[in-house]
């Protein structure tokens, strides 16, 4: 009977060791869980960025106002009979 108890205790100890420290054990599970969490956060940021870019693309495809705004800001274009003024901060003078 004692031998059986000792064998069962050793088996239980072996299983516990494998669970906590072995391959695919608790430590690796926690590391994988943290990595998944970080990847989800990165994916959320990228999804938000993609949605903004998609909205801008749709706006450029359908609306003339977006094209005009882009031309004014990026290319500094003006309409006929319009004057463009650039205000330079004091630090850049």
UniProtKB/Swiss-Prot annotation:
Its main location: membrane. Keywords: Cell cycle, Cell division, Cell inner membrane, Cell membrane, Coiled coil, Membrane, Transmembrane, Transmembrane helix. It is a single-pass type II membrane protein. Pfam families: DivIC. GO terms for cellular component: cell division site; cell septum; plasma membrane. Part of a complex composed of FtsB, FtsL and FtsQ. This is Cell division protein FtsB. It comes from Glaesserella parasuis serovar 5 (strain SH0165) (Haemophilus parasuis).
């Amino acid at each position: 009977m004692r031998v059986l108890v000792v064998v069962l205790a050793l088996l239980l100890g072996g299983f516990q060791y494998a669970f906590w420290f072995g391959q695919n054990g608790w430590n690796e599970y926690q590391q994988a869980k943290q990595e998944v969490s970080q990847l989800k956060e990165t994916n959320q940021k990228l999804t938000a960025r993609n949605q903004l870019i998609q909205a801008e693309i749709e706006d450029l495809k359908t609306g003339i106002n977006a094209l005009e705004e882009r031309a004014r800001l990026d290319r500094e274009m003006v309409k006929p009979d319009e004057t463009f003024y650039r205000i330079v901060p004091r630090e850049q003078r």
